[in-house]
Amino acid sequence: MFLFSARLCYNIDVETGYSTSQEEGVTMKQTIITISREFGSGGHFIGEEVSKRLGIPFYDKNIIQQIAEKTGFSEDFVKEQSEYAPSKNMFAYAFVGRDHTGSSLSDQVYAAQTQVIRNLSEKGSCIIIGRCADYNLKDRPDTYHIFVYGDEYEKISRTQQLFNLSEKDARAMNRDMDKKRRLHYEYYTDRKWGDPGNHCMCLNTSALDMERCIRYILDLFE
């Protein structure tokens, strides 16, 4: 085990099954990376940059269209339901909006999302952002689960720049989004969101620069 920034650790089994990467012509094994992240930590940017350098698919909001096609719901509705809890209260989330079978619209979106994520993982190496992908692919031996987090001040600063917000509004946005992500994740997985035990690598973007985080993930493909 290697420790970086108190929470970065590796637990990697090297397997066969190699394919060719577009990055510097290196050889890499087929690998699926899931990235869960705190809002404002830069996890989306890191995942997107890794996918560009390796020339492999990157899935985040582009999953929404596939989920919408499976469920018949609008893309706007799926966007709201696929990663963020509609309520900030676990009790309300568990019981509101269910039909006589006990199923809610959120449950239908989650079921379709799970199927889409598993189908995408069968197509080859890729990066998947959020949406409980770490849980849905937890039994795949060729998959590594990353959690990206950061210090509050730096996350607030990043959110301010991205959305042109005041410090107060950026802080509120970060906390609200993370609370909804946590509730959604913990409701559907029965696991603690951000638990290092569920990830092979935890990256603190306040202690490690973006390039170093990207390089750590690239190493998983070699």
Task: Identify the residue ranges that each predicted region occupies.
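Small-molecule kinase domains that catalyze NTP-dependent phosphoryl transfer to phosphate-bearing small molecules
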Residues: 86-93, 166-211
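RNA pseudouridine synthases
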Residues: 120, 136-139
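Extreme N-terminal starter segment of soluble prokaryotic enzymes
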Residues: 29-32
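Conserved phosphate-donor/acceptor-positioning beta-strand/loop module used by diverse small-molecule
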Residues: 139-161, 167-175
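Short, Lys/Arg-enriched N-terminal segments with co-localized hydrophobic residues
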Residues: 1-27
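Short beta-strand-centered segment that lines the nucleotide-binding/catalytic pocket of NTP-utilizing
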Residues: 57-68
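Glycine-rich phosphate-binding P-loop
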Residues: 35-48
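ATP-dependent small-molecule kinase phosphotransfer cores
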Residues: 68-125
